[in-house]
């Protein structure tokens, strides 16, 4: 089980992991309504190395990416939930729309993305040049069919959105 850390704390942890020869994996996202697809994705990310760091979009960046009605859960709640997962070693907040700055600072050996970004027909990966510049690798993690936060929200809205 991990913990929520500041960037300064993560810098110290990264130095320790380097000394120990541990392979650091990074993934990032909004993780607004945590679901089994997120869990399986994070478990697959952890399997790519020794230490999993999750970059969590802060509330302002989630609003910029997903719209004014999001996030449903606050950054503090989302971070605590992620840190409570056995496969997650550290959670750090970031505010940029893409993780280039975070990746350039942490320099993880592996950057994990969803398979929807995989070439040749995947979405663009703006941070690919950053990862290549420090010698990291990008791994594509299969998505879990039928599991998404947007799908969950649509299901709730379709059910009338009433409290349960």
Which residues are covered by each model-predicted region?
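Nucleotidyltransferase catalytic core that binds NTPs
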Residues: 1-164
């Amino acid at each position: 089980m991990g913990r929520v850390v500041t960037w300064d704390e993560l810098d110290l942890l990264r130095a320790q992991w380097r000394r120990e020869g541990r392979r650091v994996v990074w993934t990032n996202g909004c993780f607004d309504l945590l679901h089994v697809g997120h869990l399986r994705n994070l478990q697959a990310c952890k399997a790519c190395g020794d230490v999993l760091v999750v970059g969590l979009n802060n509330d302002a960046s989630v609003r910029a990416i997903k719209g004014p009605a999001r996030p449903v859960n606050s950054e503090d709640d989302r971070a605590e939930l992620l840190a409570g997962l056995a496969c997650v070693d550290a959670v750090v907040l970031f505010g940029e729309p893409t993780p280039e700055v975070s990746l350039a600072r942490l320099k993880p050996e592996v950057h994990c993305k969803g398979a929807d970004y995989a070439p040749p027909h995947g979405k663009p990966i703006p941070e690919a040049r950053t990862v290549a510049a420090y010698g990291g690798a990008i791994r594509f993690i299969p998505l879990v069919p039928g599991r998404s936060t947007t799908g969950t929200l649509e299901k709730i809205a379709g059910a009338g959105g009433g409290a349960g």
